[in-house]
Amino acid sequence: MRLRLLAVCGLAFIVLTAIAQEKKDPVPPAKGDAPKTEAPKAEAPKKDAPKVDAPKVDAPKVDAPKTPDPKAPAPAGDNPLAWKFTKDVPFYQEMTTTTTQNIKVQGLDVGQNQQQTFYFSFLPIKQDGDKWIVKQTIEGVKMKIDIAGSPVSYDSTNEAAAGGTNTALSEFFKAIKGSQFTLTLLKDGTVEKVEGRDEFVKKLTQSNKQLEALLNKILSEEAIKQMADPTFGVTPKEVKKEKESWPRTVKLSLGPLGSYENTYTFTYAKQTGDIADIDVKVGLKYTPPGPDTAGETLPFKIKAGTITQVADEKTNKGTVKFNTKSGRIESSKIDIKMSGSLTLDIGGTTTEVTLTQDQSTEVKTSDKSFVPDKKQ
């Protein structure tokens, strides 16, 4: 961490020498005819020079050390791309994911468009060495899903206007609002531990107990950690110069849905004022679930599958804008395009499915909540 240094000034003293002054007095002549003789000159008694006090020299003023501002961000060392936190001072994020998916199954083309927006608050509550304890709250959620012409929508900021035909899905999103997690963050932004996962799953399954087994597999502790990755997982472990890169690999197991391994390559592209541009390239690898993975919680079972990225200059990459003064992400946008095929077992019948998917995720950060005022 950066240290504040206090300069200490020494005092210089001036020593003055005393000046001696000699004084001679005449001796009166003696009486009688005696020849006059000059009395020997008597030396004037030496007088000590008066003591002269050295002039007082005022010590130079030394400012008292400044008391650290409790509202100032905690220093993050020499790494300009490191996160900074201020105890009890929250910050807020809006994360919007837009997905366009086309699925072809049994000769039918099924289109699906969805947009999900999550409103988060983050409250740093304690620093423990190089670690920070941060409380994350889902302040609100908004979603629009259209599956083959059947729309579903939910907006926690305007629940009265929620529409669509699938109220079960709306109830699922409604349960998400207000959920809290306690994150333990390492110095490089890695989420070491998450508390609140069990309460989260319990809350989501209150209205549908059949989802409990599935969500316990999909929403593992590791999966919950990855929920915070778009926020904290972009900064390097060591100091980087402009044009230098660093990798980050994220593995995510989704139980009966298989697993993903995402490899991110970050590059410190440039610095403009307080804003650092970080370029991102994304590599994706999908692995279908193993044969021993239970799939009874789903209406189908994935027997095999291949999902790869589509080579496109405009996708599978993005940009993160990091504010080096405040020590946090200002904004980010990452686009991913993929295609593939899955072999499904549906009620004992093998079905081939092909799909393409475009996905874009945007994150914004602010000192104020992004949750809009509730509509009257």
Language model region names:
Residues 1-22:
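Sec-dependent N-terminal signal peptides
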Residues 24, 34-40:
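D/E-rich low-complexity acidic segments and tails
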Residues 24-28, 47-376:
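Signature of exported/secreted
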Residues 39, 44-45, 49:
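Low-complexity, polybasic segments enriched for Lys interleaved with small residues
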Residues 11-14, 34, 64:
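Low-complexity intrinsically disordered segments
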